[in-house]
Amino acid sequence: MSKESSFDIVSKVDLSEVANAINIAMKEIKTRYDFKGSKSDISLEKDELVLISDDEFKLEQLKDVLIGKLIKRGVATKNIQYGKIEPAAGGTVRQRAKLVQGIDKENAKKITTIIKNTGLKVKSQVQDDQIRVSGKSKDDLQKVIAAIREADLPIEVQFVNYR
């Protein structure tokens, strides 16, 4: 009479926390002496960060400040993919960073392989940008979660919808 238990594996970035981290980082940048008179800016456009600064060195410092604030706000920095540094208007440089939302096919395959390699009696289904894992034993599901947490994945994953 045991019914199936399940959970979902997702990869999401909380955009409101990202916006909060950007605001806090910009406040710090405006008060820092080494950024006095610079044209440094961080903005959020849909699911993309845009970092602008005077030169590459200041851009790297800007990125370090932002990453520190994102970590304090609990945002996974693994889910940020930085683009190339490109020249922008007014002698500044720009870098775009994409916020990865959801699990792509390649990472879904890696995760399902990890689940299969555990040898437990669980089923995994890829559903769009998430993975549903189901099984009769809650202990098996917890072992799957532990195995996925131990794995070195290129994205940060969360576990939701325990049933």
From Swiss-Prot:
InterPro entries documented for this protein: DUF520 (IPR007551), UPF0234-like_C (IPR035571), UPF0234_N (IPR035570), YajQ-like_sf (IPR036183)
CDD domains with a match to the protein in the record: YajQ_like
GO molecular function, one term: nucleotide binding
One GO cellular component term: cytosol
UniProt entry keywords in alphabetical sequence: Nucleotide-binding
Any matching Pfam family: DUF520
Source taxon at top rank: Bacteria
Chain's role: Nucleotide-binding protein.
Family: Belongs to the YajQ family.
Name under which the protein is recorded: Nucleotide-binding protein GK0742
